[in-house]
Amino acid sequence: MSEEAAYQEDTAVQNTPADALSPVESDSNSALSTPSNKAERDDMKDFDENHEESNNYVEIPKKPASAYVTVSICCLMVAFGGFVFGWDTGTISGFVAQTDFIRRFGMKHHDGTYYLSKVRTGLIVSIFNIGCAIGGIILAKLGDMYGRKMGLIVVVVIYIIGIIIQIASINKWYQYFIGRIISGLGVGGIAVLSPMLISEVSPKHIRGTLVSCYQLMITLGIFLGYCTNYGTKTYTNSVQWRVPLGLGFAWALFMIGGMTFVPESPRYLVEVGKIEEAKRSIALSNKVSADDPAVMAEVEVVQATVEAEKLAGNASWGEIFSTKTKVFQRLIMGAMIQSLQQLTGDNYFFYYGTTVFTAVGLEDSFETSIVLGIVNFASTFVGIFLVERYGRRRCLLWGAASMTACMVVFASVGVTRLWPNGKKNGSSKGAGNCMIVFTCFYLFCFATTWAPIPFVVNSETFPLRVKSKCMAIAQACNWIWGFLIGFFTPFISGAIDFYYGYVFMGCLVFSYFYVFFFVPETKGLTLEEVNTLWEEGVLPWKSPSWVPPNKRGTDYNADDLMHDDQPFYKKMFGKK
């Protein structure tokens, strides 16, 4: 027996335990799944053996990890769009502290020194988010018009144009400001199209992992951006900021070159009638022959979905408000998840990191950034594993709970020990050390859960017909909150100091309850199956037990997953 055949046989008979967050999700598992689905959705324990013979659906078999090297490399190249965004984020945080940048784009004191006001700093840094929000909504439709690949190439070119304008800026801050907006337009398009393309070419059982690579690339870009700023800080001329910008230009060109080797989305190819190309794309992603019956079966499922959407006519913006197919409910969920990602307070930690680290003797803000960047980047590797091992819901719930605990400790120690009674003397080294530890704990929890998973959830939630529109709006909510937090944090934190942490603590508590009651589990499902799950109205806290229609046994009770008359506290902690 070959290694691959043995692997598939072991997978078919493997007993995977149900790792549940609460008794509700554990006990709601029922005898519903077939052997193949059981391996994919380990929240379910039993299955109907008699159903195996009647199930005619041909499914692409799961293969050893080595079989997915090609598709993984392709998805990493698409995810490199996250690196472009992260590079910009990591470098701009250092630019506003560099002497040449301040001299060129700041204002002059009476004594001849230069400074950047809070308003100008906030605008230069945060206007990028507004550009991203607009770009995501306007440019995301390029993926529907010309394909995901070509759409990505176009938005990267727009990003490059913005970089050129910034590099060419001499001493007019508004020229640099305009360049930031244009670069933001490009990154906004990247943030929608990159996760979208990855989700549509990935095999379903590693889709969450591969989409999470987008966030991994963001953290890598941020970290290397910090390192580059550290390397150029000793210069006294425009090398300080023009070299990092020039490297950003080079990274964008690298991505454009790499995109030529990436397969197009099979769902887009089916939509435009290129069936043979769609079969080759699916075959490449799953390491099988294009003539494999399972490939044709998947193409037929996509075709059926596309044909149903075509019968309904062209998708309009008004259609996203439809409640009949649960599109509006999905949009609200996607927008909330993206908004709550910002409201978890990660940017608050990066803003206060310099202050806290200074209190214990680390006075170099560039060194502080590198420390935080290392923790953020290294932790994301753990998140890539967790998203497929434990699922989307469970990771988000764990993340919200653990970050709440970290935020409570961080804010409380800051208020009562580091700056007692609002006195900013930073006299307690023990308090500072404690806050550093919990800053790192917080970043670990964020990077493994709430950093990557909102991108995963949004990339697989919406039907193909309105996917680009819904993802653009959801992502725009993220950018807008990013702008608001980035712009107003210096003013708010200056007024209430570490009490600001309690605001984010409240947002994290709300996030926990929101995820439990409104975010369904989609691990191990195809994109078409996710669509069916939503249309059937399955309750999110019962969704781990849901089984696709073509895999159900004779005793499957769909109604049981759509109704729950228990009080909310029993839904969360009680047994059925």
UniProtKB/Swiss-Prot annotation:
Glycan-carrying positions: N425
Compartments it resides in: Cell membrane
Transmembrane segments: 67-87, 123-143, 150-170, 181-201, 208-228, 243-263, 347-363, 370-387, 395-415, 438-458, 476-496, 498-518
Assigned GO CC terms: cell periphery; plasma membrane
Annotated spans, Disordered: 1-56
Main localization, broad class: membrane
Extracellular side: 88-122, 171-180, 229-242, 364-369, 416-437, 497
One matching Pfam family: Sugar_tr
Membrane topology according to the record: Multi-pass membrane protein
Keyword list, A-Z: Cell membrane, Glycoprotein, Isopeptide bond, Membrane, Repeat, Sugar transport, Transmembrane, Transmembrane helix, Transport, Ubl conjugation
Glycyl lysine isopeptide (Lys-Gly) (interchain with G-Cter in ubiquitin) crosslink site(s): K45
Alphabetical list of Gene3D superfamilies matching this protein: MFS general substrate transporter like domains
Activity regulation comment: Xylose uptake is strongly inhibited by glucose.
Function: Low-affinity glucose transporter. Can also transport xylose.
UniProt name for this protein: Low-affinity glucose transporter HXT4
The species this protein was found in: Saccharomyces cerevisiae (strain ATCC 204508 / S288c) (Baker's yeast)
